Amino acid sequence: MAGRIKGITIEIAGETTGLQNALKDVNKRSNDLTKELKDVERLLKFDPGNVEALAQKQQLLTQQIENTTQKLDKLKAAEQQVQAQFQNGKISEEQYRAFRREIEFTERSLNGLKNNLGNMKAEQENVASSTRQLETLFSATGKSVDDFAGALGNRLVNAIKSGTATSRQLDQAIGLIGR
């Protein structure tokens, strides 16, 4: 990404600097967050109900959204200067197109992160809703999850008891108990 916008200089707060240098901190932070997010997602692949990892993923996504928004703001702030440089012949058409692609890429990346965070929040709401349904069912029947171990299986019962069951697992439990 960073190599795409070489040779473009902009003025920020009265100082002339290369666009790459202006984005250096934001890009470094983005790379660090991406690496950490990949580690968390790898853990979640093996343990999808890990509450600590889910909380970390949500926090990292939020930080990544903030960071990407900051990058997009810097790119948008430089846009007029870059356009003027292109019109005056100070930068090539290639450089200008690369700058435009960088803005597009950053916008799409930001939208993807927001969707990912939204999907995560929707999953949390589904888990909360299914948990409430199970609690209502247990209180209405006067039974506990252990009473349904035969129908649910020990793995599902343990996931429900430890709070690591996914919304799909909770829906499955509701379906099995409701029979």
Label the model's feature ranges.
Residues 1-4, 8-18, 22-50, 54-88, ...:
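Residues at a specific register/face of alpha-helical coiled-coils
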